[in-house]
C-alpha cells in the first residue's frame, strides 16, 4: 500500500478533485498536493525516508516544469523505484505516450483527464496485489 500520495498539477482545482477521489477511498491522510512541480521534487528529495512507497499523480503540461522534465530529474537523481507515477493529462498525443515510455522505471499508467475514480481504484487494486 502507498504510504504517500503526491498530487502534482498546476491547476489547484484538478488537485482538489483528485484529492476528493482519494478521500472517498479513505486515503486523505496520505495526500500531499502541489501546484508547483519544483516544490514537489524538493519534498521528495528531502524526505526522512526516500524509500517510502509513493504514488505520484503527475500532470504533463505545467508552466514551471513539464511532467517530463519532472521525470527527467527523477531519473538523473536516481530516485528509488518505490516512487510510482501516474501521468494524468488532457493530452491524447501519441508523442506524449511515446515520451512516457522513456520513463517506464517510474511511469505505470498514462491517464487522460478527467481522472475517473473507477480507473484509479483498478490501478490501486492491481498495484497492491
Question: Where on the chain are the PLM-derived regions?
Answer:
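C-terminal output helix
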Residues: 114-124
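Receiver (REC) domain active-site loop signature in two-component systems and cognate sites
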Residues: 62
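Helix N-cap/capping motif at the beta->alpha junctions
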Residues: 33-42, 67
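Conserved sequence signature across two-component system core domains
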Residues: 8-10, 34, 56
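Active-site beta3 strand of CheY-like receiver
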Residues: 48-57
Amino acid at each position: 500500500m502507498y504510504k504517500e500520495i503526491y498530487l502534482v498539477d498546476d491547476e489547484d482545482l484538478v488537485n482538489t478533485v483528485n484529492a476528493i477521489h482519494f478521500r472517498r477511498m479513505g486515503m486523505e491522510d496520505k495526500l500531499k498536493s502541489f501546484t508547483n512541480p519544483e516544490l514537489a521534487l524538493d519534498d521528495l528529495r528531502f524526505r526522512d525516508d526516500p524509500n517510502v512507497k509513493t504514488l505520484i499523480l503527475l500532470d504533463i503540461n505545467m508552466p514551471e516544469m513539464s511532467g517530463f522534465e519532472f521525470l527527467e530529474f527523477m531519473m538523473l537523481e536516481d530516485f528509488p523505484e518505490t516512487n510510482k507515477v501516474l501521468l494524468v493529462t488532457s493530452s491524447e498525443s501519441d508523442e506524449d505516450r511515446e515520451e512516457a515510455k522513456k520513463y517506464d522505471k517510474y511511469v505505470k499508467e498514462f491517464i487522460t483527464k478527467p481522472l475517473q475514480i473507477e480507473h484509479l481504484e483498478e490501478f490501486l487494486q492491481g498495484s497492491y496485489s
